[in-house]
Design a protein with these regions (language model features):
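Core catalytic alpha/beta fold that binds nucleotide/phospho-ligands
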Residues: 1-101
Length: 101
């Protein structure tokens, strides 16, 4: 989902949101094509994929998932990507990433 908001300067701000179900077997199949080695080795595929999808929804198309969408974990609930911060939320077996925050 992409949400367009008006900020105080009257310019549009794009927000990206993505939801991933933990344990989705497709993540292991696509990880090598869309994630960096260190992102895969971190063991947080759901959060990485949800963040990359949220960034792509906010700033794509034309972005490469490996080259352009690098994910770094700042804390359990905060990810850095594209020079911005992205919030991670978990509920049951669902991971939601939204931002930038």
């Amino acid at each position: 989902a992409v949400i367009l908001l008006k900020d105080t300067t009257q310019e549009s701000a794009r927000i990206g949101v993505d939801l991933v179900i933990q344990g989705d077997p497709r993540l292991e199949r696509i990880a090598g094509r869309v994630m960096r080695k260190e992102e895969i080795e971190g063991g947080r595929l759901e959060e990485v994929w949800a963040c990359k999808e949220a960034m792509y929804k906010a700033f794509g198309p034309g972005l490469d998932f490996v080259k352009d969408l690098k994910v770094d974990f700042l804390s359990k609930d905060l990810i850095s990507g594209m020079g911005r911060k992205w919030e991670v939320r978990r509920k049951g077996n669902t991971v939601v990433v939204l931002g930038p925050v």
